């Protein structure tokens, strides 16, 4: 039996538009982002996808993308589970900074390493910083010492995988069709795990906003196939635009 899993990165956020490092900062969608969410829902509807359960982060840009997509799908009733483990990678001291200005200051190669390497985190945010998640009530039930002040993709994967194994994978194994709406790096982490790609290969992977990525999995959740829904050239162009965000102007 083929299991179906869709990974969907949130639509354009205000800080995507502003070309700023976002991480765990809770910024909302732009009007374009809301349109991308609806368009993603239409692509999934045209594909004939009938979901059984959905998962998202505790950040509004992902939550609102999921809501917009489900509305277009006419599946608003779907059970939705939110977890901090699906949050974007924490960008530490880079959060809020302009990507192009940071590239001009530190060099494009350094910014590419911070953005896309596997195991090198950006400079950490101090725990006393008001923006540290330890000061955010949505994480009040978690051990403050376990909350990140920065993350690499490797540590993001360590954060995401327990939720995959404990919550998402059992639903897929039970034959459920699953939608995960999250963020560029939490989805890159899942992509790396599912496709078992190397640390070097993940450096070149960019996930575009608002375009559903459909995986077909076997009974053991091994990948049989995967593809972006809609126009593959449009997905390619959108991924290239993500890659270019870290370049100096």
Swiss-Prot record:
GO terms for biological process: gluconeogenesis; glycolytic process. It comes from Xanthomonas campestris pv. campestris (strain ATCC 33913 / DSM 3586 / NCPPB 528 / LMG 568 / P 25). The keyword Isomerase applies. GO terms for molecular function: phosphoglycerate mutase activity. Homodimer. Its EC number is 5.4.2.11. Belongs to the phosphoglycerate mutase family. BPG-dependent PGAM subfamily. This is 2,3-bisphosphoglycerate-dependent phosphoglycerate mutase. It catalyses: (2R)-2-phosphoglycerate = (2R)-3-phosphoglycerate. The record marks 183 as: Transition state stabilizer. The active site is at 10 (tele-phosphohistidine intermediate), 88 (proton donor/acceptor). Keywords: Gluconeogenesis, Glycolysis, Isomerase. Substrate binds at residues 9-16, 22-23, 61, 88-91, 99, 115-116, 184-185. Catalyzes the interconversion of 2-phosphoglycerate and 3-phosphoglycerate. Pathway: Carbohydrate degradation; glycolysis; pyruvate from D-glyceraldehyde 3-phosphate: step 3/5.
């Amino acid at each position: 039996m083929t299991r179906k899993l869709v990974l969907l990165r949130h639509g354009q956020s205000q800080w995507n538009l502003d070309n700023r490092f976002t991480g765990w900062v809770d910024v909302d969608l732009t009007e374009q982002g809301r349109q991308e969410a609806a368009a993603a829902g239409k692509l999934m509807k045209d594909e004939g996808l009938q979901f059984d359960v959905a998962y998202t982060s505790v950040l509004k840009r992902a939550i609102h993308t999921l809501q917009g997509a489900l509305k277009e799908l006419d599946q608003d009733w779907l059970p939705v589970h939110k977890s901090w483990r699906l949050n974007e990678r924490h960008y530490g001291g880079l959060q809020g900074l302009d990507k192009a200005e940071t590239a001009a200051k530190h060099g494009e190669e350094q910014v590419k390493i911070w953005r896309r390497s596997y195991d090198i985190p950006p400079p950490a945010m101090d725990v006393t910083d008001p923006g540290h998640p330890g000061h955010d009530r949505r994480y009040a039930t978690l051990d403050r010492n376990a909350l990140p002040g920065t993350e690499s993709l490797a540590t993001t994967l360590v954060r995401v995988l327990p939720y995959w194994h404990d919550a998402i994978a059992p639903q897929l194994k039970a034959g459920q069709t699953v939608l995960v709406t999250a963020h560029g790096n939490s989805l890159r982490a899942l992509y790396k795990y599912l496709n078992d790609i190397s640390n070097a290969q993940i450096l070149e992977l960019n996930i575009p906003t608002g375009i559903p990525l459909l995986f077909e999995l076997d009974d053991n959740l091994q990948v049989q196939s995967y593809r972006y829904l809609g126009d593959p050239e449009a997905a390619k162009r959108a991924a290239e635009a993500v890659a270019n965000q870290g370049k100096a102007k």
